[in-house]
Amino acid sequence: MVRRLQEYYGIEWFPEDGASYPVRVFLMKDIGTIGIDTSGVSLHKRGYREVSGKAPITETLAASLIMLTPWNKDRILVDPFCGSGTFPIEAAMMGANIAPGMHREFQAQNWDNIVSPKLFSRGFEEAESLVDTSVEMDIQGYDIDPQIVKAARENAKRAGVDGLIHFQQRPVHHLSHPKKYGFVITNPPYGERLEEKEDLPALYRDMGKAFAGLDGWSEYVITAYEDAERYIGKKAAKNRKIYNGMMKTYFYMFPGPKPPRRKKMVQPEE
């Protein structure tokens, strides 16, 4: 590549200053694709998660899984294994209409000779104008680890949604809620180490008992633990195989009943 540029421009040396233009080569079987990386840091990194737990789910996968459920901002959402807060934060960002790339930088922002900085500024300004953090939502995140709960709060603050989520230290067997028709969307422990695997049956039993006490709720669980249904105590209506990075996981769907439709108020005739 350097030789070709030397021939084209008729010069022997290029100064190594200014903006970087990373070149990526992608190989798929016998086909190679060469491109310039305009993003820099991988797009699955939103820019808010500086601290994460043991087996974090990527921001993009969390958002995709939420969109696979019927949840919307008018419904309660609880994550009893919230870790660094990815599910609650992504849900709150959706509800507040916060664009996923607002809290990060892109490699091409420094390419003044190719992309005008005004285009990025205009895009960020437009995205900012559409944000609505005044929206009322009931989103809660719980975890047994007080330090990771603290990290989740800090991540939510960086994402601009700390006022929309309630985080608290709480074990899964204390999970309860007085209201009906809520959602649990969660990424519980998988048991990556042998000693952790021994604890999984009891943990998933506790989760199943907690689910049984939630009246009319829907539960969605992503896990690599293949005995999840057995110990949760019920069969999923649907089970999707999904890769979290290189790890094969399962997205178990336990949909609950739909809430009754609200009756429209009829105005009396004058």
Which functions belong to the PLM regions below?
Residues Q168-E270:
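C-terminal catalytic and target-recognition region of SAM-dependent MTase-like enzymes
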Residues D37-T38, R46, A92-M93, I232-K234:
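Short acidic, glycine/serine/threonine-rich loops at helix termini
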Residues V2-Q6, R153, G208:
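Generic solvent-exposed, charged/amphipathic alpha-helical segments
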Residues M28, F81-G85, N244-M247:
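A short acidic Gly-Thr/Ser loop motif
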